[in-house]
């Protein structure tokens, strides 16, 4: 980022990419107080205009200096955005929120980037779950975004997302506007030994110690996925008098699953019979290479391969199942997978 490159950050959800982005931004702001960093999560957006509204709310008004009048900014940049002004509850400084109409979305996004350009400040913008752009009905939304950002030299962007196949296609396929427009980066699991040492530093402050063997056991339960590891560690940290053993790890996981019982039951009830059968089979298997193979189908009494294929696609679309880089299929939510294994 400091060398002027845009970055595409690809990683499964809950491995820690959002935390990494915020950490990098904090490091950059510490190194240079003049830089401006903005984070926008566009996962909830369904339309291009909603995405533009999210970006506008994150950026507009944040680069003003005390000497710059609100009126000038309203007149020059944001009058068309239907701004609503309110005082910041802590500083008292004016803050803005915006409503973007679909017919004004392109003009608005142009104004947002023009605002950053005119500020003269070095700006870093992270757009998380950027693959949502590919789902918008707006024709040419990705082409327009690319055309805007390439002419703003003081703005550098992190395109982040969790749906690897969509992001890879957007940034690595010659038929898409973002082809070769950024540096592709992926996040892997934290090294188990380094992670164990890091976690143990906190337990030592409680007068306890977790052996590397126990931590590796915990780590492997959830495939080293950061959010799940942290969830278990947090549960263990809240019981400072217990010895840190594999048994206490299992107890902690049991409590977590019990807390989510209603949510998991509701998710399960929303599935069709074929989807539920396949998802449970994948959970019990752990990792599945060929879900439509005769061996797998017979072992778990699944329907015909064509029905399994249809159920698999639906489970992937709903993000119940994730396909790894190796082409293997796993239950996306590791705790949900553990809960499914317990079903009769």
Regions from the PLM with identified roles:
Residues 3-7, 11-15, 19-124, 155, ...:
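P-loop NTPase nucleotide-binding core
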Residues 27, 144, 235, 314:
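Alpha-helical DNA-recognition elements
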Residues 117-124, 132-137, 144-175:
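Sensor-1/coupling segment of RecA-like P-loop NTPase cores
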Residues 169-220, 242-243:
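Helix-loop-helix "sensor" segment of P-loop NTPases
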Residues 215, 238-260:
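Conserved C-terminal helix/linker of AAA+ ATPases
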Residues 215-221, 227-241, 277-280, 313:
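C-terminal helical "lid" of AAA+/P-loop NTPase domains
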Residues 258, 262-344:
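C-terminal leucine-rich, beta-strand-based interaction scaffolds used for sensing/assembly
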């Amino acid at each position: 980022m400091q060398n002027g490159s845009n970055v595409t950050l690809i990683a499964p959800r809950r491995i820690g990419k959002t935390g990494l982005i915020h950490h990098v931004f904090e490091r950059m702001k510490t190194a240079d107080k003049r830089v401006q960093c903005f984070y926008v999560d566009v996962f909830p957006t369904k339309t291009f205009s909603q995405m533009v509204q999210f970006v506008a709310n994150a950026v507009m008004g944040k680069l003003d200096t005390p000497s710059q009048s609100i009126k000038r900014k309203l007149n020059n940049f944001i009058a068309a955005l239907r701004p609503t002004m309110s005082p910041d509850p802590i500083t008292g400084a004016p803050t803005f929120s915006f409503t973007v109409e679909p017919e004004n979305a392109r003009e608005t996004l142009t104004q947002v980037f023009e605002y950053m350009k005119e500020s003269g400040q070095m700006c870093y913008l992270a757009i998380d779950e950027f693959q949502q752009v590919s789902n918008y009905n707006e024709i040419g939304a990705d082409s327009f975004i690319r055309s805007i950002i390439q002419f703003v030299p003081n703005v550098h962007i992190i395109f982040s997302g969790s749906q690897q196949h969509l992001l890879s296609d957007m940034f690595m396929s010659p038929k898409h506007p973002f082809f070769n427009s950024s540096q592709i980066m992926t996040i892997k699991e934290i090294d188990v030994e380094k992670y164990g040492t890091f976690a143990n530093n906190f337990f030592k402050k409680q007068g306890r110690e977790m052996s590397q063997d126990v931590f590796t056991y915990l780590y492997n339960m959830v495939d080293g996925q950061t959010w799940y590891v942290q969830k278990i560690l947090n549960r263990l940290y809240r019981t400072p008098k217990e010895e840190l053993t594999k048994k206490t790890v299992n107890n902690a996981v049991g409590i977590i699953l019990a807390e989510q019982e209603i949510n998991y039951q509701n998710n399960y009830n929303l599935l069709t019979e074929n989807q539920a059968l396949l998802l449970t089979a994948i959970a019990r298997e752990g990792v599945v290479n060929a879900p439509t193979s005769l061996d797998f189908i017979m072992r778990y009494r699944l329907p015909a391969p064509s029905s399994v294929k249809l159920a698999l696609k639906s489970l992937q679309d709903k993000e119940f199942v994730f396909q790894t880089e190796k082409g293997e299929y796993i239950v996306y939510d590791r705790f949900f997978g553990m809960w499914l294994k317990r079903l009769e």
